[in-house]
Amino acid sequence: MLKAKGYKTGIFGKWHLGHHPEFLPNNHGFDEFKGIPYSNDMWPVDYDGRQVPSDHRLAKAYPQLPFFQNFEVVKEIKTLEDQGQLTTELTEAAVDFIERNKENPFFLYVPHPMPHTPIAVSDKFKGKSEQGLYGDVIMEIDWSVGQIMKKLKEHQLHENTLFIFTSDNGPWLNFGNHAGSALPLREGKGTAWEGGQREPCVIYYPNGIEGGRIIETPIMAIDLLPTIAEITDAELPKNKIDGKSVLKILTGEDHQSPQEAY
């Protein structure tokens, strides 16, 4: 969609749509891909970091976690220490992508594997949050956001860049201190309660959206694609799109959700 408008496109993080070549990002609109093809818990390792025996269900279901650069597996993620390098490595790739494309319109997608379990953090953030391992992981993601924004500001791109920070679901409460919390909302991932479905969403776009506001009108993640299409004047794909543009809600021109059900 955006490539047709001359955008350079990159994804650095979790693709989550499979590892076979026909399903990889480079065959679905992205110029560059660096990251893992599915969730970081899809590997033959238990949550405590131990390799499972060959007859374990995880060993039967998954190989070592592959790390891709475009179509090539460049390494395998085998340990929690390996996982702990992902946030920084993907952030550095994202910042480099901005640097190389600062003269072009670009679309950058950074779906970090963390804080999905199993969680891990780089050495530079271990123990820094004083909120345990989960706090350290969130602190490193916060650093990642800052690095990306810093690079945008370095090249005076931040005011004309649509910056979206959000999540896909609530905390996986089964994992206790490794899961986070949705309080004061009820429950978490895998439930229909608000703690599982209602997520933070921060949108920053100085040239198009007035800042400093809290928008109460509900929107959905599937609304982001048509919203981006409207902002960039791009043509939506011909296949059915369930999302609706919420640009008028973001600009304050409308306060009515375009969706009938959530």
Cite the ranges covered by each PLM segment.
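Formylglycine-dependent sulfatase
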Residues: 1-262
